[in-house]
């Protein structure tokens, strides 16, 4: 699973995800992509599950690019622990995703296979997404 090798700080504020994505909104590598339509934190496990679904549907042909990286530590407190007494320990890593962000890109497969693969990958994610393709690749 994806996670940073090292970070400046162990824990991060929860924060909110406002506005639209400024960068990472265009297809840069592949011919087809999956674009986020909602703001959400996507965990490293969800990214990996989606990647596996996409590569399986493509029958190992073509190439997949992951355009998001889980760089935010998410901390939780254990079950049945009283409020207070500090912030919990980091449990997993998540990527903050804004609407308009390209999540995955693929190439080297026909458009029908690409659409099927990305829809199977989208089913593993907690947000609404949209299939996009490069203009001229019909």
Swiss-Prot record:
Pfam families: Ribosomal_L16 (PF00252). One of its GO terms (cellular component) is cytosolic large ribosomal subunit. It comes from the Bacteria. This is Large ribosomal subunit protein uL16. One of its GO terms (molecular function) is structural constituent of ribosome. Part of the 50S ribosomal subunit. Keywords: Ribonucleoprotein, Ribosomal protein, RNA-binding, rRNA-binding, tRNA-binding. The keyword Nucleus does not apply. Belongs to the universal ribosomal protein uL16 family. PANTHER family: 50S/60S RIBOSOMAL PROTEIN L16 (PTHR12220), LARGE RIBOSOMAL SUBUNIT PROTEIN UL16M (PTHR12220:SF13). One of its GO terms (biological process) is translation. Coiled coil: none annotated. Binds 23S rRNA and is also seen to make contacts with the A and possibly P site tRNAs.
């Amino acid at each position: 699973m994806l996670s940073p090798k090292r970070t400046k700080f162990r824990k991060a504020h929860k924060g909110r995800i406002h506005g639209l994505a400024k960068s990472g909104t265009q297809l840069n590598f592949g011919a087809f992509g999956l674009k986020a339509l909602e703001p959400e934190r996507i965990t490293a496990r969800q990214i990996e599950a989606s990647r596996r679904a996409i590569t399986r549907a493509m029958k190992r042909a073509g190439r997949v690019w992951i355009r998001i990286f889980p760089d935010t530590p998410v901390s939780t407190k254990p079950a049945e622990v009283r409020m207070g007494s500090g912030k919990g320990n980091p449990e997993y890593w998540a990527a903050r995703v804004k609407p308009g962000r390209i999540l995955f890109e693929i190439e080297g497969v026909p458009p029908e296979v690409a659409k099927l693969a990305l829809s199977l990958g989208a089913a593993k994610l907690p947000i609404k997404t949209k299939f996009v393709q490069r203009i001229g690749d019909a």
